[in-house]
Amino acid sequence: MLYPQDFDVIVVGGGHAGTEAALAAARMGSRTLLLTHNIETLGQMSCNPSIGGIGKGHLVKEVDALGGAMALATDEAGIQFRILNSSKGPAVRATRAQADRILYKAAIRRMLENQPNLWLFQQAVDDLMVEGDRVVGAVTQVGIRFRSRAVVLTAGTFLDGKIHVGLNNYAAGRAGDPPAVSLSARLKELQLPQGRLKTGTPPRIDGRSIDFSQCEEQPGDGMPGGVNEGQVPVFSFMAHAYGGAAMHPRQVPCWITHTNARTHEIIRSGFDRSPMFTGKIEGVGPRYCPSVEDKINRFADKESHQIFLEPEGLTTHEFYPNGISTSLPFDIQYDLVRSMHGLENAHILRPGYAIEYDYFDPRSLKSSFETRQIQGLFFAGQINGTTGYEEAAAQGLFAGINAALQCRGVGAWVPARDEAYLGVLVDDLITKGVTEPYRMFTSRAEFRLQLREDNADMRLTEAGRRMGLVDDARWDAFSRKRDAVSRETERLKSTWVNPRNLPTVEAERVLGKAIEHEYNLFDLLRRPDVGYDALTTMDGGKYASEAVSRETLGELSASVIEQVEIAAKYAGYIDRQRDEVQRAAHFEKLRLPEDLDYMQVAALSIEVRQKLQKHRPETLGQASRISGVTPAAISLLMVHLKKGGFKGFAPQPADGVETVA
């Protein structure tokens, strides 16, 4: 039957990408339908029970700055929080949290069920409705046809998914869930460029069978024995509205054990029955989250590997042994687990497995994540060749935004590489593609000094507000923070300290030595060993400001002070990076003609011509980042375009992007 109600946006899949896509489109006012094979698994953490990490935490903060759900759900469900790289500079500091699976899923479902403009429907999607070269809806497995103006496909590992345990394999989307075979076949009919990838998960262990006395305890930040005892971090910029760290459930530790020579011997004994080494698995696995058999094979000289025992929640005894993802036969899994200290009597609750699935080459996507072949069809998440909850959530939000904008008849929103990790993620995928599951790192961002976790809201919340993603409560909190940062920065720059009026004892206490001439407070704060709190207590507190005190700003006070202090200490570095951004921006604004025949650009090598013809970059900046396209090739392309003696120049667009001419 044809469902009687039409929608603006249909989202297929209810994982981390799908939920953020649906919430974003609905927040922007689009009539949105989320189709999932099982409403009970909305927001399910299919693999590890954690959110965040290096690069990944930055994405979560950006999703949050745009009104997304992941950070708040993690604050509501997080049972351990840590700031990684806390001793390093702010650009690479990252938040990571262990989450209670049940609480996380419940938080996501509540947000979905209470979001205006969003409808949920439980049915697997078997087909897409396509008229000409445009998608117009989706068809479920029982033949219900839903019409829409855009479809966001977030199928995760379900497209023709196959689970491997040893030499045994069976069709599945993940353990306990059926694969999307018909939908996979339909996408192949549409001739979208496709490949196979694989990922894996470790066996789960009953905590009652673990001897924790043989393991090393790893408390979270704020816990007894942890860093900053009594001060548990939060993820969301809006956590203060819900009590800050008080909204977290009970905090618990993780534990550490190690593999050993016996473990490695057991693993090697199973290589002849490993689907990875016997060719049963065709897909490429994630480089930065390899299976334990891959680690033992690749790093044969390493005598031991760290294994983190992570609790799955407060109401279960289940533990996730991070570091032993495997598809080895179960008898090998059983022996390798029991070979480690503390796990000698471990009971395995679920076997580890590898899952192989279809993905589609993201280089065939427009910069909005709309497919080039089918108008109105957007891809997000693992279908684009990525791995990780955070990467999926960021892509889902991005695709949901652009699907909603398309329904409004408005151009796509694409953040630049210097504006967001989301911009780096999108640009990497559409220009470089993937040869293995892609995960985010801070090292992928060349402008990471200005892409920090702490300023994600300062970078993105205004854009989110313009698009309708940010509600009044978030906007009010952001506006207070932004204005307080601006006022306090100006106050520090305009408040001068004269050596005649500053007692030497106070100068030495706070600054380390007496000052020889007049300085403003901002310049004093730039000194490596001078902190904001110490500076404002100098000389009896005469340089303090009530405007940024906890009494005035409440929970926002700490984040305002953090922004001001980072701006001062890294001012020189950030200014230099802004100069680099401006130089790079020239290429980003040069739009390439849509119908340019690169094969006719005789000055370029055959390899470069073929790559440009295949990937069809939208701007000269994108072209410069395609693998194999050299700076010399870009210069030659510029010369060819500036001659201008050919058809197909794009008209001057209204959005400020220039056309090469």
Curated annotation (Swiss-Prot):
InterPro entries in the cross-refs: FAD/NAD-bd_sf, GIDA_C_N, MnmG, MnmG-rel, MnmG-rel_CS, MnmG_C, MnmG_C_subdom, MnmG_C_subdom_sf
GO biological process: tRNA methylation; tRNA wobble uridine modification
Signal peptide segment: none
Cofactor (UniProt): FAD
Keyword Cytoplasm assigned: yes
Compartment annotation: Cytoplasm
Domain of life: Bacteria
Keywords: Cytoplasm, FAD, Flavoprotein, NAD, tRNA processing
GO cellular component: cytosol
Binding site for NAD(+): 285-299
Family from the record: Belongs to the MnmG family.
PANTHER family xrefs: GLUCOSE INHIBITED DIVISION PROTEIN A (PTHR11806), PROTEIN MTO1 HOMOLOG, MITOCHONDRIAL (PTHR11806:SF0)
Function (record text): NAD-binding protein involved in the addition of a carboxymethylaminomethyl (cmnm) group at the wobble position (U34) of certain tRNAs, forming tRNA-cmnm(5)s(2)U34.
UniProt name for this protein: tRNA uridine 5-carboxymethylaminomethyl modification enzyme MnmG
Organism of derivation: Acidovorax sp. (strain JS42)
Lineage, opening ranks: Bacteria, Pseudomonadati, Pseudomonadota, Betaproteobacteria, Burkholderiales
